[in-house]
Amino acid sequence: MNSYLEFEKPVAQLEARIAELRSAAEGDEVDISNELKRLERKSAALLTSTYSALTPWQKTQVARHPQRPHFRDFVKHAFDEFVPLGGDRNYGEDEAIMGGLATLRGRKVVLIGHEKGNDTESRLRHNFGMGKPEGYRKAIRLMDLAGRFGLPVVTLVDTSGAFPGVEAEERGQAEAIARSTEACLALPVPMVATIVGEGGSGGAVALASAERVLMLEHAVYSVISPEGCASILWRTAEKAPDAAEAMKVTAQHLLDLKVIDRIVKEPTGGAHRDPSAICETLANAIDEELDALADLPGETLRRMREERFLQIGG
């Protein structure tokens, strides 16, 4: 069952009407197929027009949709033979950041990403995708393995930001984020990062400092959440829509600013409406990018990463 966002209410009303008609038609001899088709066309057209004109704040809501596919969904539908690897070999395990060995279109890769969870229990277990120091150190360990064994690195970024708790600070959160970013930039193998939902602050950059950065059509990427920005500038989170507009958080804005390299189109109505379709589309896009990078020497890859970040804002 779809969970509707506030701006989707007209679509929700139409789809509810369609469901009522279908239910009423069961066992009824009256033919209402034409009316159903008319309403379905109207609903599809309304959904298309709504999603073709989303504001940055509405895109932020879509990026946070509770039914949006997360790391485990992409593992299930886009990758094969996933072997999870856990722990940072120093403090412990962090399930907000997952990783391991996987196969993408026959190519062995090291896969790393944020997992938010999809219900109360799993969200608590995965800490809502907010990585802790041990999570980023685990990512560093996996990137080191990738470099040693010549495996390309694929990252799926979806976090509101790194965990800001006192215990994370005590264990060196800032250092872990910085080291993870450094590990990305120093990799001697190809790296493709994708912002699949929220890309929040350094917690996202630590897994997204790649030579190729992709972004799903309705994902967002920023240094702070719109609510956080609004609270600082206007002393109220109610100005979040204005903050989202000003911060240029959308894939379309970030492509123009050369922060990302490619937008991956989502199904009409967002990735949550057809998770298997977006997984297939993203798998194809990542595979294409890895093909283009496969024969480049390590020094060239490192230089590409350095140059892409130095030219941002230039």
From Swiss-Prot:
Any matching Pfam family: ACCA
EC code: 2.1.3.15
Domain of life: Bacteria
NCBIfam families: accA, AccA_sub, PRK05724.1
HAMAP family (alphabetical): AcetylCoA_CT_alpha (MF_00823)
Task of the protein: Component of the acetyl coenzyme A carboxylase (ACC) complex. First, biotin carboxylase catalyzes the carboxylation of biotin on its carrier protein (BCCP) and then the CO(2) group is transferred by the carboxyltransferase to acetyl-CoA to form malonyl-CoA.
Protein name: Acetyl-coenzyme A carboxylase carboxyl transferase subunit alpha
Primary gene name: accA
